[in-house]
Regions:
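Left-handed beta-helix
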Residues: 2-4, 202-357
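Short beta-strand segments
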Residues: 10-11, 60, 111-114, 144-148, ...
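Residue-level signal for inorganic ion chemistry
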Residues: 41, 97, 116, 159, ...
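Conserved N-terminal catalytic core of the sugar/cofactor nucleotidyltransferase
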Residues: 1-9, 17-24, 35-114, 120-124, ...
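General beta-strand structural signal in soluble alpha/beta enzymes
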Residues: 59, 82-83, 112, 143-145, ...
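Conserved core of the sugar-phosphate nucleotidyltransferase
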Residues: 122-237, 260, 310, 335
Length: 357
């Protein structure tokens, strides 16, 4: 019996906060930054493959990463990789997948997930996803998965719940507040982080696009009509060149009145920075996260080191540093100044062009 459950993996980002290891030619989602032996996108596929059949996956990515996707997920076919000509944030990405699924199966239920998150308690996570799928099947609802915040982080969307039910209607959805507001949210105990994982019926999200992002609805309806025809590639290129770049959070989730959240605790991290890698990495007795081979540290504490295979490094006298070495770039930066990585990238690009980016 054919399944109506589908999983859409968003895999188009370049992971600039993980520079210089994450590069335009090989971004974060295709790397094994945590040393598990598998890339982030491979972990993501395997996580959802226990819920969704291989034929019901779609991966939305930049056109230049298509071969990488197929290399890391050989279970899927070429037609399951939707290629964005240029990145336009998450709303166009999700629209491309949603209108493709609407054409294929109007009864589809969609799980939408980033490609590069860490889930430590996968059984608990899949139980929550199953509950969300059942809820979405019975209701006209847009569901997101919420995470109890541990700090006032300005990099996440925040969800205010209206009650203490397992699946609660969202009272307020605020995308990336400033620090003062994030601190207030944390103090109330009513707010959760938005994990960026969504569940809904394809009909529900298409209706939300029609209602809240009508220009995207019109454009991607045109893409849907062109699917499988000679005009498909040209239509997709035109739509992505003309459509407004906007996140699904700003474009729909903050405006819609049928948003629900299932909050959970399953060891989630978006692993968005070297600092978060340090947090989850195995450490020595001096709190250093260093490779098991080839790295010799002296009088060094609370630092993280990433080296290419076969490279030897001797490090002495560092406290709370990030050291990332690649074949052509070495970055040494205090952990407290990690937010400057994008500034470093701009400086390198200004003087050396794109070859090191």
């Amino acid at each position: 019996m054919a399944s109506n459950k589908y999983c859409v993996i968003m895999a188009g980002g370049i992971g600039s906060r993980f520079w210089p290891k994450s590069r335009q030619s090989m971004p974060k989602q295709f790397l094994d930054i945590l040393g598990t032996g598998k890339s982030f996108i491979r972990h993501t596929y395997e996580r959802f493959a226990k819920i969704v059949p291989a034929g019901n996956f779609l991966v939305v990515t930049n056109h230049k990463y298509k071969d990488l996707v197929l290399q890391h997920i050989p279970e899927i076919g070429e037609k399951q990789v939707l290629c964005e000509p240029i990145g336009r944030n998450t709303a166009p990405c999700i629209a491309y997948a949603a209108y493709t699924l609407l054409r294929e199966n109007p009864d589809a239920e969609m799980i939408v997930t980033p490609s590069d998150h860490l889930i430590l308690n996968e059984d608990d996570f899949r139980t929550i996803i199953g509950e969300c799928l059942e809820f979405a099947d019975r209701h006209d609802a847009l569901l997101t998965v919420g995470i109890k915040p541990t700090r006032p982080d300005t990099g996440y969307g925040y969800i205010q719940v209206s009650d203490d039910h397992a699946i609660s209607k969202v009272k307020c959805f605020t995308e990336k507040p400033d620090l003062e507001l994030a601190q207030t949210f944390l103090q109330t105990g009513e707010f959760y982080w938005n994990s960026g994982i969504f569940i809904w019926k394809v009909q529900a999200i298409v209706e939300a696009f029609r209602k809240y992002l009508p220009e995207h609805h019109a454009m991607f309806s045109g893409v849907m009509k062109a699917l499988g025809t000679d005009a498909e590639k040209t239509t997709v290129e035109i739509v992505f060149s003309e459509c407004r770049a906007i996140s699904i959070d700003y474009g729909i989730m903050e405006k819609a009145d049928n948003v629900y959240v299932r909050c959970g605790n399953f060891g989630w991290s978006d692993v968005g920075t070297w600092g978060s890698v340090y947090q989850h990495a195995r450490k020595d007795r001096y709190a250093n996260a260093v490779p098991e081979e080839g790295c010799y540290v002296y009088d060094t504490r609370s630092s993280i080191v990433s080296l290419p295979k076969g490279k030897v490094a001797v490090i002495s006298g560092l406290k709370e540093y990030i050291v990332v070495d690649t074949d052509d770039v070495l970055m040494i930066c205090p952990r407290a100044e990690e937010q400057n990585i994008k500034k470093f990238i701009d400086e390198v690009k200004f003087h050396n062009g794109d070859k090191h980016i």
